A protein has these predicted regions:
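Structural/interface elements that position substrates and couple domains in central-metabolism enzymes
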Residues: 2-88, 94-144
């Protein structure tokens, strides 16, 4: 039986997209990479009034992205998170699982081209909504 936390219907995606206000972006890129989805998707979210919290994997010297303080781990981000938007290769998502589970966001979104069913199952079992292999910017434009 499919988990109710594995969001796969258009209705479930629409409902999630409409309620996000605060998003941590795991694997965000810097302004120097403005042509890459890991920068321009969070830039779009920021431009429509969603609070974007940068959690880059690289760029140890960077202190801010999109004018927001950078955090190195999900658990270090203060306050609740509506969503963690993940820009990591499918095979690399699992190395962030414990950090994401410890933070307990309401939902996790694996961007277009990113799918890891083992991670999605663990998140769903913890009561965290999961979307895989979809672009948050495309779905936000469509439904919000």
């Amino acid at each position: 039986m499919a988990s109710p936390h594995r969001l796969e219907t258009e209705e479930a995606i629409r409902d999630l997209v409409k309620r996000i206000r605060r998003v941590a972006v795991l694997g965000i890129k810097t302004e120097e990479h403005s042509d890459q989805p890991a920068f321009y998707v969070p830039e779009y979210l920021h431009s429509v009034g969603i609070e974007v919290i940068p959690v880059p994997v690289y760029y140890p010297e960077v202190k801010e992205i999109l004018g927001q303080k950078v955090y190195r781990k999900m658990v270090d981000v203060p306050g609740e998170l509506d969503l963690v938007d993940v820009f990591r290769k499918s095979k690399d998502v699992e190395q962030h699982l414990d950090d994401i589970l410890a933070k307990k966001p309401k939902a996790v979104w694996l961007q277009a081209g990113i799918r890891n069913d083992a991670v999605a199952d663990r998140l769903a079992a913890a009561g965290i909504d999961v979307v895989q292999d979809r672009c948050l910017m495309v779905d936000h434009r469509r439904y919000a």
